[in-house]
Each structure stands twice: as C-alpha cells, then as structure tokens.
Regions:
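Basic, amphipathic DNA-recognition helix from helix-turn-helix-like DNA-binding domains
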Residues: 170
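Residue-level detector of conserved catalytic or cofactor/ligand-binding positions
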Residues: 1-11
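AAA+ ATPase active-site-proximal loops
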Residues: 9-149, 154-160, 165
Length: 175
C-alpha cells in the first residue's frame, strides 16, 4: 500500500540510519538536520558514491515538505534537450515525437522537493531556466506559452568543483 511505502521511505531516510562515526560525518549530519527544517535551496558536493542522494532524501523526509513528492533527476544521464523536457515538460507538438503533453519533474515536485543530481553537467542555458524557477517560481513547458507556477524546494548535488567551473564560465555564479 501507499501508506506502507511512505513509512518505509521515511525509515530509510531517518538520520540514525546514516551509518558512520567520523567527526566529519557528524558535522555534516548536524548541518543536514538544521537545513532539513528550513526551506532553503541546498547544494551537496561530494565524490561519486559518497551518499549525496541519501543525504538529499534525509533532508526531504525530515522537512516540512516530507508529505509531498521527492522527485529525483540525474542531469548527467540525459542530453540537454531531453533534460529540459524532463524538467519542464512539453506540450503536444513541441518537437518531433512529442505526440502528447507531458508534465515535467518541476510540476511533479510541486509542494515537495526536486533533487537534481550531477547539476554540474547541466548546460548554461538549462541553468538559466532553473534559476528562473528558483527566483520567480515559474516556467513554461517546452513549446508552451502558458506560465506555470510551482512551489518546489531544490536540492542539487555534484561531484564537480563548481567554484572553478564558475571561474571558467561553465557554471552560473548566481545559481
């Protein structure tokens, strides 16, 4: 049942289920517990396989948005045009093969949390569109003219060195 699934998900993301006793991990968990209670956008940086998605899930499932959707997108797994369609959705006929309207991940996460994994792989154009959603809480589906409003908390993760990417113009400083 859906209720049993929700209980299971909450149990997975309980802070005491994140295993580790190092001082560094305890510092991270202290920060994560504080961040979970806020509504702020979060950036998680760490090497591949270090549990960034687990931390993102713990933040969501211990937040005021925990009763709403936790939607995950791996930005590195999709080409730019597919990523934009995945994030923002598209209208019927927006591009070849768009035979019906599709709701994007931002709409699916409305009221909840959107987790963007490997955000450092995102193009500057898509970064600008993400920034608009963060600042204005609105966007249009691909091929659409109607502005849609959403209330989404964004948690992003990367294994990249974003400060050096900002310096080289590969990543937006304001994002």
């Amino acid at each position: 049942s859906s209720a049993a699934s929700d209980v299971y998900k909450r149990q997975i993301y309980e802070f005491d289920r994140i295993v580790g006793s190092s001082a560094a991990l305890q510092r991270v968990l202290g920060i994560v517990k504080k961040v979970a209670k806020s509504n702020t956008t979060v950036m998680i940086r760490g090497e591949t396989g270090t549990g960034k998605e687990l931390i993102a899930g713990a933040i969501h499932h211990n937040s005021l948005r925990s009763a709403r959707n936790f939607v995950k997108v791996n930005c590195a797994a999709l080409q730019e045009n597919l990523l934009e369609s995945e994030l923002f959705g598209h209208e019927k006929g927006a591009f070849t093969g768009a035979d019906k309207q599709r709701i994007g991940r931002f709409e699916q996460a409305d009221g909840g949390t959107l987790f963007l994994d490997e955000i450092g792989d995102m193009s500057p154009n898509t970064q600008a569109k993400i920034l608009r959603v963060l600042q204005e809480h609105e966007f249009e589906r691909l091929g659409g003219t109607r502005t849609l409003r959403v209330d989404v908390r964004l948690i992003a993760a990367t294994n990249r060195d974003l400060p050096s990417m900002v310096q080289s113009g590969q990543f937006r400083e304001d994002l």
